[in-house]
């Protein structure tokens, strides 16, 4: 595995005539990231991973400074997973002038974007920069961040970016808790209680399967999540996927998405329901 940190080093490490699978991350790798690498490894000649904690997607009162970082650990995991090129740039490398940024016009003011203004502008700005640098054949994103995946797919279509976006399933603990770098902030008791999030989402999906109306499913989902102690609901939403718009009679896929705030960790999770 080759570790590079500058644009020049990255460009010299990229192959000219082979397919590239790209896995962008913010580090503190876990099994969810490893599953993305596994998919990339299976479908491409070369696998490139980036590790960069992107400052422009954090708000002024968010956890940028305390976001978990352990490059030595990440390097070991990336190497063991079969990553060929690990790109580990500085903020100065990724934002040399910070003259221009991507602005998201639709879908960024709902779900996570409702309480994190500017977040997805930062996400798509860094994704745009990384796509320009790596020029991957395929890029791999986990559906735990389903809103992010939908917006990246829209960006790729709008800007005619020649990359295939691969949606990858959520990797979970045995309890159902979605794997996340922020799980490290949970206490032992909170870790147990947080597993109830997926249980509530699963029951909501089953209610849709049984033909219950969207409003009633949402009401029941809120009730179940409200029962989780020492937590606060940030949002509970059912939206059309991948448009992220209101559910209509034409909707064939629905995203059931939630965000729950514990003392030191804000967790997101979701399930996708398909009609028929």
Curated annotation (Swiss-Prot):
Keywords noted in UniProt: ATP-binding, Cytoplasm, Ligase, Nucleotide-binding, Pantothenate biosynthesis
MF terms in GO: ATP binding; pantoate-beta-alanine ligase activity
Principal EC category: ligase
InterPro entries, sorted: Cyt_trans-like, Pantoate_ligase, Pantoate_ligase_C, Rossmann-like_a/b/a_fold
Pathway where this protein functions: Cofactor biosynthesis; (R)-pantothenate biosynthesis; (R)-pantothenate from (R)-pantoate and beta-alanine: step 1/1
Annotated protein name in UniProt: Pantothenate synthetase
CDD domains tied to this protein: PanC
UniProt source species: Exiguobacterium sp. (strain ATCC BAA-1283 / AT1b)
Active site positions, chain numbering: 33 (proton donor)
The protein's Enzyme Commission number: 6.3.2.1
Catalytic activity: (R)-pantoate + beta-alanine + ATP = (R)-pantothenate + AMP + diphosphate + H(+)
Additional observations: The reaction proceeds by a bi uni uni bi ping pong mechanism.
Subunit structure of this chain's protein: Homodimer.
Pfam families recorded: Pantoate_ligase (PF02569)
Taxonomic lineage of the native organism: Bacteria, Bacillati, Bacillota, Bacilli, Bacillales
Keyword Cytoplasm: yes
């Amino acid at each position: 595995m080759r570790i590079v940190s500058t644009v020049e080093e990255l460009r010299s490490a990229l192959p000219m005539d082979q397919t590239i699978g790209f896995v962008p991350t913010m580090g503190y790798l876990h099994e969810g990231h490893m599953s993305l690498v596994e998919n990339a490894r299976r479908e491409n000649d070369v696998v490139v991973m980036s590790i960069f904690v992107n400052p422009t997607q954090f708000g002024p009162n968010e956890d940028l400074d305390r976001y978990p970082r352990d490059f030595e650990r990440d390097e070991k995991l990336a190497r063991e997973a079969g990553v060929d090129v690990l790109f580990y740039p500085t903020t100065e490398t990724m934002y040399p002038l910070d003259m221009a940024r991507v602005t998201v016009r639709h879908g960024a003011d709902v779900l996570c974007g409702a309480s994190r203004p500017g977040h997805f502008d930062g996400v798509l700005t860094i994704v745009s920069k990384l796509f320009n640098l790596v020029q991957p054949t395929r890029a791999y994103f986990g559906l735990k961040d389903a809103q992010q995946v939908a917006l990246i797919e829209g960006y790729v279509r709008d800007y005619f970016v020649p990359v295939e976006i691969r949606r990858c399933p959520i990797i979970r603990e045995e309890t159902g808790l979605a794997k996340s770098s922020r799980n490290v902030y949970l206490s032992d008791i909170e870790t147990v209680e947080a597993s109830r999030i997926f249980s509530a989402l699963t029951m909501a999906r089953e209610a849709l399967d049984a033909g219950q109306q969207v409003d009633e499913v949402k009401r029941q989902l809120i009730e179940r999540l409200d029962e989780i102690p020492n937590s606060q609901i940030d949002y509970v939403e059912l939206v059309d996927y991948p448009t992220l718009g209101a559910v209509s009679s034409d909707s064939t896929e629905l995203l059931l998405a939630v965000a729950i705030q514990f003392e030191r960790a804000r967790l997101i999770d979701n399930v996708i329901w398909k009609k028929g």
